[in-house]
Amino acid sequence: MIYQMQMPAKIEVDETTHTDYFGRFVAQPLERGYGVTLGNMMRRVLLASLPGTAITGIKVDGVFHEFSAIEGVREDVPEIVLNLKKVRFRSTCKRSCKTTLTITGPKDFTAGDIVAMEGEFDVLNKDLHIATVNEGSTLNIDVFVGRGRGYTPAEDNRPESMPIGYIAIDAIYTPIRNVKVAVENTRVGQRTDYEKMVLDVETDGSITPDDSISLAGRIINEHVAFFADFSPTEEEFTEEEFKQQDDEFEAMRKLLNTKIEDLDLSVRSHNCLRLAEIDSIGDLVSRKEDELLNYKNFGKKSLTELKEQLEKFELKFGMDITKYQMKG
């Protein structure tokens, strides 16, 4: 049997903090445990699976290995490599590309000096310092830019036909700077054990927070679909059964919304329920028997009459009907 579960009506966006770089998204209500489950899933996919652009390697004239110093440049190669890892791109290229730079001193070489030869990419953090070229010196450097997902170590960024002096770099492709997940309790009806998930997403500007969670959600959905399509036997979990469960759920919701005056009750019972502001069957079954007996003029005879009416619909007092309530 397939049970209806509490689901958020929509993802809420905190407009007071929303920018092109930061977004706070709220999903509620969720069943207990699902805040952590969905939050961790989104966090992992956002950080590790979104595509992006990064520098994958460099080649510097006169340099043959990554632990060299460069004549006329204040920083050594390892320090320059560390700075190049921080360069962030907005890119339209779907393949690796190379740009050749000639930096003549005196010059503060920044990320903004890295310009695509055919406009394949734009640098976002143009003020990022890369190196200082002294007066009378020239830095000739080839910068190789690639497209990928998540993170790739330097050893995986060495091409088969690697030119002499090529230095591979750890590529941080992910456009996501940080993801935080917070889970809190939230109330639905009389129950307080449902969960609210708050997802904070910070990007590098190459993708908006809204687009990033949408893309992460699609990636997750594509993978989970394999399990949704899996069936141990042909007879189990057919489309007809899913439809039957949906029909039963809607029928129950309609029944619970039925007005009390539509029931075949005595005038005394009708008046007691009206004074107690119990207007629908849903209002009635959500009450407990001892609660009803505390209402004025409501006795055991009226209680018995109501129980007989509810039994006709296979209902009883003290039911939890929160999952049938309309969200809005």
UniProtKB/Swiss-Prot annotation:
Q: Name one GO molecular function term.
A: protein dimerization activity
Name one process (GO BP) from the record: DNA-templated transcription
Q: Which GO terms describe its cellular component?
A: cytoplasm; DNA-directed RNA polymerase complex
**Which intervals of the chain are annotated as region Alpha N-terminal domain (alpha-NTD)?**
1-231
User: Which reaction(s) does the protein catalyse, per the Swiss-Prot or TrEMBL entry?
Assistant: RNA(n) + a ribonucleoside 5'-triphosphate = RNA(n+1) + diphosphate
Keywords in alphabetical order: DNA-directed RNA polymerase, Nucleotidyltransferase, Transcription, Transferase
- Region: Alpha C-terminal domain (alpha-CTD); residue ranges are 252-328
Alphabetized SUPFAM superfamilies for the sequence: C-terminal domain of RNA polymerase alpha subunit, Insert subdomain of RNA polymerase alpha subunit, RBP11-like subunits of RNA polymerase
In terms of SMART domains, this protein maps to: RPOLD
Functional summary from the UniProt entry: DNA-dependent RNA polymerase catalyzes the transcription of DNA into RNA using the four ribonucleoside triphosphates as substrates.
Q: Which family does it belong to?
A: Belongs to the RNA polymerase alpha chain family.
Note the subunit structure. Answer: Homodimer. The RNAP catalytic core consists of 2 alpha, 1 beta, 1 beta' and 1 omega subunit. When a sigma factor is associated with the core the holoenzyme is formed, which can initiate transcription.
The protein here is known as DNA-directed RNA polymerase subunit alpha
